Amino acid sequence: MRLLDALRIEAEGLVAKVQQSNLFSHMGDRGEFREQIIQQFLRPFLPPCYGLSPGEVFSSDGEQSAQVDIVIYDAVFSTVLFRSNTRMLFPAESIFGSIEVKSSLSLSELEKACGNIESIKRLTRRQADAMDLLPFVRFPLGPGLRGGGDFRNPYLGIVFGYKGATVDSVRGVLGDRLSESGVNRHCLPDFVFVADPGYMVYRRQQDGTPAYPGGDFSTYGWIPTGADNLALLFLTLNSCLGNLRLRRPDVNALWIQVFRECCQQAGWMVT
């Protein structure tokens, strides 16, 4: 298939770019360069409606995430703050998820990545379902008709490492977090990809099949990916994004709030 061929060819070209990043002596510069490599790999294959940028995410109740390597956001319909800057600020309602990029995914770096992903996944927002055709368009149902009710806007959380720890140790860290008392399992990463030695870790349901983001899962499974690690990263991302929906905040309620505040500040009666 031509798409898969193109993905594999593009992935092969990333090896030279990763080697170029080794010319940076400052680890922060090297890490930022490698984040851009992943963006440059994904960008040509993703529709323009999906934006990719580093930044932070905030919710309507005042909570805010950590700084995230790559935020996947709605680049067409949703509000984004400081869009012209290299790092943006995103309302929780405007994003699909995030990718944490690590040059070397040690266990300590995995813990940090889990923390960053959790800082997004714990942000509250209105639930979207199949009736949300666009962030601001909801399919109307007539009297007596029912629809929707499914959960279509979980936050997607992916960790990618160019090199990394063994798959058993990565699964061990995730398994320990999964078994901790009081932990919200849905705040854990959905997928972990490591290009060298080449594997994917995924949420696994009780019947052994992969779980979609937001779905129930019992443990973490894995498969060896070999040279197809980056190709599988893109295909996984594309498959998940195709099932997600967004729902904008209640702008009408915000309008009424600001309208009333303006009237009150002017000393006018508000009915």
Predicted regions and their residues:
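Intrinsically disordered, low-complexity Ser/Thr/Pro/Gly-rich regulatory segments
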Residues: M1-Q67, I72-T271
